[in-house]
Structures are given as C-alpha cells and as structure tokens.
Amino acid sequence: MAKRVADAQIQRETYDSNESDDDVTPSTKVASSAVMNRRKIAMPKRRMAFKPFGSAKSDETKQASSFSFLNRADGTGEAQVDNSPTTESNSRLKALNLQFKAKVDDLVLGKPLADLRPLFTRYELYIKNILEAPVKSIENPTQTKGNDAKPAKVEDVQKSSDSSSEDEVKVEGPKFTIDAKPPISDSVFSFGPKKENRKKDESDSENDIEIKGPEFKFSGTVSSDVFKLNPSTDKNEKKTETNAKPFSFSSATSTTEQTKSKNPLSLTEATKTNVDNNSKAEASFTFGTKHAADSQNNKPSFVFGQAAAKPSLEKSSFTFGSTTIEKKNDENSTSNSKPEKSSDSNDSNPSFSFSIPSKNTPDASKPSFSFGVPNSSKNETSKPVFSFGAATPSAKEASQEDDNNNVEKPSSKPAFNLISNAGTEKEKESKKDSKPAFSFGISNGSESKDSDKPSLPSAVDGENDKKEATKPAFSFGINTNTTKTADTKAPTFTFGSSALADNKEDVKKPFSFGTSQPNNTPSFSFGKTTANLPANSSTSPAPSIPSTGFKFSLPFEQKGSQTTTNDSKEESTTEATGNESQDATKVDATPEESKPINLQNGEEDEVALFSQKAKLMTFNAETKSYDSRGVGEMKLLKKKDDPSKVRLLCRSDGMGNVLLNATVVDSFKYEPLAPGNDNLIKAPTVAADGKLVTYIVKFKQKEEGRSFTKAIEDAKKEMK
C-alpha cells in the first residue's frame, strides 16, 4: 500500500513539473470502477486551487497545494495543478474534526479530569450523518501553461479514499460452481421424492453407466414373536400340568382335572378337596393352618401354624411348650404290679424340656436336662442326669398302689444335685435312690437311719437293706445327720465341718479342709483339729502316728500317741496319754498361734519418694538393641535418718525378684534417652565389678518419666 501511494505521488509531481520520461503520455490512467472496488487504495486529500487572474507563483497556490514542499529547488516556481476532486462530505468532515479538536482542547484545559464520553457519542452521531450523505464531486479548473495546448482531461470517477469508503467496499470470497452435473443418472442416496423409473436407452455411452451401492432392505414381517406381552385369550383349552409349582402364593382349590402332585411349599391356607387321600403327598413346609382328614399321612417336618390334626406317633426332640397328650388306655394302668403299655406308651420325651410336662404315660423317659419343676406321675420314670429345679414328687408309683404286691421300681437320682433335696418320707421309703456323686446342698434327711449315706438305697415297707452305701466323693455341704449308723464311710475330701461324733468306727481321712472332730489325725491338715475321745476310749484301738507330709497346722496328738511293744502297757496307758495330749495341745497351741510371722524386705526404715510400674531394659552391643530385664515396680527410696542415702529398687511382678538395686549418685545424670522420649529414662549404675551399666527405665506415659526424673533431682538437692 505504501509503495503504491509513493508511486502515485511521484508521477503526479513529475507530471506537474514536466519531468516525465515519456512526454507522449500526459497523465496516468485511472483504473476502472470494477478494479477499484476490489482493492483499497489510499489517496491524499487535495485542495482546490482556483486563481483565474493570478500567477502560478502566488502564495495562495502554495497554500492550496498539500504537497508544495516538493517543488523544485531551482526556484522556477511553476504552478502546480491539483486535479483531485473535492467532495462536500470531505469538507463537512474537516469542519467537524476542527470543531471537535477545539472543543476537546478547551475542555481538557479547563477540566483535566473531565469525562469525554459525551463528546465522542455526539461525534459518532455527526460523522454517521456525514458518511451517509450522497457524494458530490467537483472538478477543479485546469490551468493553462505558456502554450495553448490543452492537456487531456482526466476522468475522476474515483470515490474519496477516506475512511468513509471502507463501508462501500464489498469483499467477496471465492465462489464454487459446477458447470456440469455428475454423469450418474440414478444416485444411491436420494433426499427428495422418489424418482420414476425411466427406461434406459441401449447405448454405449459412459455417462449412462449406472453405479449402484449396497442396499439395505428390511422388508418382510416377523413370523413368530419372541416376547409375547398380551395374555392368551383362549379360555376353552384345558391344559393339565404334570409338574407342580414350587411355590404357591394363593389358596389352591384342586379338582380332578388338575394335577395330583401338590406344591412343596404352601404359603396360604390349603383348602384342597375332592382328591384321593392315598395318592396325596403332603407339603414339606406348611405356613398356614392345615386341616388334614387322614391321620395316617405324613406330617410336615416343620409346622409354623396351629395344626388341627391328631398327634403323630413320633415326638420332636425339642419341646418348647407344655405337652397335653392324653393316654388312650387309662384303665390298664391300675391294680397291676407291671402296668400294660398304652397305644402311645412308646413315645419318648424330648431330650431337652423347657416347660412343665403333664404327660401321664407310664413309660415316658425324662429329659436328660430338666430346667423346670417336673410333675412326676405314678408311672416309672427315670430322673434327669442334671437337676436344676426343686423336685416335687407326687405319691407312690403305680406299681406300689397294691398293698399286697410290694414291687420296687428303682428311679435314678440326678448325678449332680445343685439344690436341697426336699423329698417326702413316702418317696424315700418307696424308692431306691442312688445318691449323687457330688453333693452341693444340705442334706436334711434326719428321719431315716441311712439318710446320711447319699448312695445307700432305701428299703421298702420297713425292710432294712444291709448293703453298704458309699458317701459322695466330694462333699461341699454341711451334713447335719446325727443318727448313728452301722456302716459309714467318711468322704474322701471334706470341705465342711463334720459333726459325726457318735460313729463307732472312724476311718482316717487323707485330706481335711475344715474343722473336723475325728479321733484320727489327717495326713494333710489345713484347719484346727481337736480330738474328742469318748469315756470308754480304752476299748478303742490306739491312734496311729500320722504320716509326715504337708502340715499347715501341726497335729499335737502325736506326742501322747506313741505305742510300745507291750500290749498290756498299751491298755493301761491309753487314757493317760490321751489326757496328756489334750493338755499339751492347749498349752503349746497358744504360743504357736500367737507368734506373728515377721516378714521384712529391707524397706522398713526407708521412705518411698517415687513408685510406678515400669519396664527395665539394658543395651546389647552385639545385637544393637535393648534387652528386657523384666517388668516391676520402680521405687525411689530414701533413708529416714540419712537423706543422703537414696537408692533405686525394682522388683519383678509376681515372684518379687530384685531387678535393680543401685544407689543414686549425685554426679550421674538421670535424663531421657532422647529429647522427645520422656518415658525412656537412662539410669546409670555401677556394677559389682566396677563397670558402668546404664539401664533404660521405660514408663507407659511420658508424664511418669518426667515425674521420675524430677523426684531424682529433688533427692539430689537434699543429698548436698
């Protein structure tokens, strides 16, 4: 753009001063309007110089020419001709700009901080009016030279090259046009209405060659539906299903036309009728009320509703409710030594019974574990192994109702009895009870002669059985029976005080844990034993010397119980030695019992300044780790009379072994192992061989470690 402007200026100046190289061509040729519309050419503004009577060297000519400074320097001063047209819009625009400049200068000088936006809005309005006005061109008059030759007129069809011409220029882009249509007569893809099939002429022209692409056809109808959403309306057909539905959610009213196989699971009330009972298969699981007519059919394994049918022959292993099954043949159970069994006498009670059974069948076996109060009947019953409730037996068994026939029906007692036996006298006389191996309650059977023998069977109708009964192996209760028995065995282990003072023959007990008063001294005595010898003790054999074992209370009867080889001397001195042993017991027992045990740990004359549980560790140079010495109570002890003597003492938990016993040295530093580890305290000590050993005392909390170091520092201050 700048080059074109420069060339135009040079041509114009050379033309005015006759410096053109080609004199034949008087002026430049203006391009056509079509060419000028396609390109933008900036032209300088021109002034109209009109001096019909003046010379070309006048000052007006110089002022009128915008390029008067380009005159030749030789001073010829020939007049220049300005042939550029001056339009009315240019004059208006110039006047507008001069007024706008003056207004802006006045406003800025008066008010430097003024807002110029209103001026620009008005300027924009005025300039739009000027640019929209029609352009009128005015031709400048031509000036003649010295000769009479008239130069050719230059057609000025150019528009103003001002910025106003920018709106009139239309820039059009390239256009793409297709001269001929494609040779394809029938296209593959059609976007308009369907074309009619034209008959093709038989020719060899290449333009008529039809190019066909792939075709996709979806014609045809689906013969069979994969998914049928509409239900079938054919209600006349009757289809018989051979397989039963696994689940039934509604009440089924089966008929002869339907299948005979029933649903395995029935979730509602089954009201099926008109079905053959022999081919009827009951449901495995029944969740509703079932009205079964045939009692011989199989019952459901699990019944969650109330069954209105008759009870089955098999009873459940677990019973959670009271059973109210009646006997069928009641009349056969009386006036017989061995009653006949009823129709359901073979029924077995559940293994676990959690309620009071009211079944009166003759041969009902009791549950192994009984958690309730059993109502025993007349029939023969077996007691449970473990009895946790008070036994309230009824009257005699059915076999003992007849006075003439005395038949014994043994019933086993529970092996473990955790409550007191409150049985009636009739039951004890009528039954042979095996006493429990372990007795945890107080036996109150004082009326019978052999009631203190837990395992001795009782006699029926006053008959005394001579068989020997054994005591329980372990007796944890107090036996209050004071009657005399012929054959009595003392329990192996006795944990309570025994009051069997009138027994004729006493057996030495190996272990005695309570206060007992037998004549013999036990091997292991854990309590005070006092021998009560009867008046006719001369007839009883002399007590033997007990074996030496673990004696926590010395049996003092051994001083007067030594025997001699002479039998006559033993009989004469038995009573004297017995009296002397009792006196020696009273005299020697007083100082032995009153003497306290003096336990000293060496801390009696010291004051504990600090005491806290801690873990003691030492550093192992080989493994580069800390080895634990033990866990115990870390104490800081100070002498009461000498504050300068302070030591560290740590005993292990349990055995009380000394883990650390070292004197606190004033020059040693007892500080944390690291600045952040206040619970790990270094405790330097001097070993027996003179070496320095540093222990690490590990506390659970950091506050405990701070208290430990503070207690040591306070003790050091008192040492000085």
From Swiss-Prot:
Phosphoserine sites (modified residues): S17, S20, S137, S165, S203, S205, S348, S351, S581
Localization, UniProt: Nucleus, Nuclear pore complex; Nucleus membrane
Compositional bias ranges of the Basic and acidic residues kind: 147-159, 193-202, 424-435
FXFG repeat spans: 189-192, 285-288, 302-305, 318-321, 369-372, 386-389, 438-441, 474-477, 493-496, 511-514, 524-527
GO cellular component: chromosome, telomeric region; cytoplasm; mitochondrion; NLS-dependent protein nuclear import complex; nuclear envelope; nuclear membrane; nuclear pore; nuclear pore cytoplasmic filaments
Subunit structure and binding partners: Component of the nuclear pore complex (NPC). NPC constitutes the exclusive means of nucleocytoplasmic transport. NPCs allow the passive diffusion of ions and small molecules and the active, nuclear transport receptor-mediated bidirectional transport of macromolecules such as proteins, RNAs, ribonucleoparticles (RNPs), and ribosomal subunits across the nuclear envelope. Due to its 8-fold rotational symmetry, all subunits are present with 8 copies or multiples thereof. Binds to the nuclear basket of the NPC through NUP60 in a (GSP1, GSP2) GTPase-GTP-dependent manner.
Protein name as catalogued: Nucleoporin NUP2
Pfam families linked to this entry: NUP50, Ran_BP1
Region (Interaction with SRP1 NLS binding site 1): 35-50
Keywords, in A-Z order: Membrane, mRNA transport, Nuclear pore complex, Nucleus, Phosphoprotein, Protein transport, Repeat, Translocation, Transport
Misc remark: Present with 2960 molecules/cell in log phase SD medium.
Compositionally skewed regions (Low complexity) per UniProt: 345-360, 479-495, 534-548
UniProt feature, compositional bias: Polar residues: 81-92, 243-278, 315-324, 373-384, 513-533, 574-584
Any one Gene Ontology BP term: mRNA export from nucleus in response to heat stress
Primary residence: nucleus
Organism of this sequence: Saccharomyces cerevisiae (strain ATCC 204508 / S288c) (Baker's yeast)
Domain notes: Contains FG repeats. FG repeats are interaction sites for karyopherins (importins, exportins) and form probably an affinity gradient, guiding the transport proteins unidirectionally with their cargo through the NPC. FG repeat regions are highly flexible and lack ordered secondary structure. The overall conservation of FG repeats regarding exact sequence, spacing, and repeat unit length is limited.
Domain RanBD1 per the UniProt entry, residue ranges: 583-720
SUPFAM superfamilies xrefs: PH domain-like
Repeat (FXF) residue spans along the chain: 67-69, 216-218, 247-249, 352-354, 550-552
SMART domains given in the database record: RanBD
Residues recorded with modification Phosphothreonine: T361, T590
Region feature (Disordered): 1-33, 52-92, 136-278, 315-604
